[in-house]
Amino acid sequence: MSDIEIAQANEATAMWPITKVAAGLGLSEDDLELYGKAKAKLSFSALNALKDKPFGKLVLVTSINPTPAGEGKSTITVGLGDALQQRGKHPVIALREPSLGPVMGMKGGATGGGYAQVVPMEDINLHFTGDMHALTTAVDTLAALIDNHLQQGNTLNIDPRRILWKRALDINDRALRHVTIGLGGPTSGVPREDGFDITVASELMAVLCLAENIADLKARIGRIVIGYTYDRQPVTVADLKVTGAIAMLLRDALKPNLVQTLEHTPAFIHGGPFANIAHGCNSVLATRTALQLGDIAITEAGFGADLGGEKFMDIKTPVLGKTPDAVVIVATVRALKYNGGVALKDLQTENVEALAQGFGNLKRHIHSMQSYGVPVVVAINRFTSDTDAEIQFLIDACAKLNVKAVTATVWADGGRGGLAVADAVLAALDQPAHFTRLYDPQSDVKTKIKTIVQKIYGGADVDYEGKANSALRTIVKNGWQDLPVCMAKTQYSLTDNAKTLGAPEGFTIHVRDIIPKLGAGFLVVMTGSVLTMPGLPKVPAALNMDVTDDGKISGLF
């Protein structure tokens, strides 16, 4: 059965009403805002009632550099939650919301897979509770208000050539990366160059995911720099006097969404910034709520430990007020062989030599996560093509690093297939975690960037090209240099070149621009050729999707 067929069978016969899932967390129906029988948001009153409740343990799930198909990080996260529940624990999962861009493009669904999924699968992958639409509307409303300000006299003296704020769409559409607007004469606006980001790359997504309450949301929105004046002074949303309007559009989107796994483990799915072009973590509110309602919160960060993992540690944890007690790194035999130079078409053939060559990639990620002082477990997401010799090589190679590596078969077996991972995680949680920051936020911007390049990526140096040096001068001039940095980089490589696989050393990262995101509270460092509006592949996943006359969806994954 396909993922969607498994999910639909569960939804028809076994899925609990969300009120029953909530009751297991100690929540009443009055604490919920229901979206049908299977989805709910937590009310602000429920969130406020939890504010003084102590935290449980926190487990971060990250991964090695993936193949284009992904390595099952969300699947392992869900399966680990189900396995911990089978071990008598009270886990709560916290995941990101899928973006329609990858759903319709490369990946198909993004709610786990097989018998380790969150449900209702179709709803979550498509429109869910409307958060993405609210964000897109808020982004584009702000853009419209900026252009209206230009049209109505421009009292703030905004330079149309130096507007940073872009419009957004939650779909991959390369044709919208660079557009010209305001054509059609004097009544159609001020002509200028503009562009679209995918919604999950917009600063408002990061703001939503880092905001702790409505007051913090408004403060962060007000700080967003939308552009510069003719004399190069920053202009913020607060200067436009539209902070309240934008926050109003995001009021309900700020509330975490509660759903369940196939095995009824509670899961908060909320916020979805990409990890290659944003900070890649679900909302602080969702993770914090999971920590307060369960004894173990399991969350994931996007792509590999070099992207989402690093950003979770350096950007999210200071806001969350909690550091991980253990880290799970998801690895697959196929991805390590891919990093060892095997072509995609040959990944199902046994090749221990290539696996050994690609193991350097996993080793780099293990060392980078260990540098934070947190116990590490490796979860090998086993595929049917993996051989016993390949699996044993990985287990032995990790053992030489004093790291426990175990296999998981949660796609096929659900929580039962994740019991070995659960046991390894529980053992790791018994070890002390001595969290250490990677860098001092007060250090200069170049030092922070170089620290990440050397300690996380294994690189040697950083080259500043194009607009990067003038951007640095602007950052220092305005006193923004104390913010953490958010690296925008390809997910397929430790370098900024997607074709450079494995664990290279001595390379240079090329920085082409640095964009201040004062609302989010970080500086986005644009490297290589990474894009904030992806394109669709030659054969989009959308080509296999359909809906029957009675409304049943097929081909979502």
UniProtKB/Swiss-Prot annotation:
Documented EC number(s): 6.3.4.3
Name of one Pfam family that matches: FTHFS
Database matches in PROSITE patterns: FTHFS_1, FTHFS_2
Reactions catalysed: (6S)-5,6,7,8-tetrahydrofolate + formate + ATP = (6R)-10-formyltetrahydrofolate + ADP + phosphate
Gene3D superfamilies: Domain 2, N(10)-formyltetrahydrofolate synthetase, Formyltetrahydrofolate synthetase, domain 3, P-loop containing nucleotide triphosphate hydrolases
EC main group: ligase
GO biological process, one term: tetrahydrofolate interconversion
Pathway in which the depicted protein is active: One-carbon metabolism; tetrahydrofolate interconversion
Keywords on record: ATP-binding, Ligase, Nucleotide-binding, One-carbon metabolism
Ligase recorded as keyword: yes
Keyword Nucleotide-binding on entry: yes
Binding-site residues for ATP, renumbered to this chain: T67, P68, A69, G70, E71, G72, K73, S74
Membrane-spanning residues: none
Gene Ontology terms, MF aspect: ATP binding; formate-tetrahydrofolate ligase activity
Family affiliation: Belongs to the formate--tetrahydrofolate ligase family.
Protein name per Swiss-Prot or TrEMBL: Formate--tetrahydrofolate ligase
Organism the protein comes from: Lacticaseibacillus casei (strain BL23)
Taxonomic lineage from the root: Bacteria, Bacillati, Bacillota, Bacilli, Lactobacillales
Gene giving rise to this polypeptide: fhs
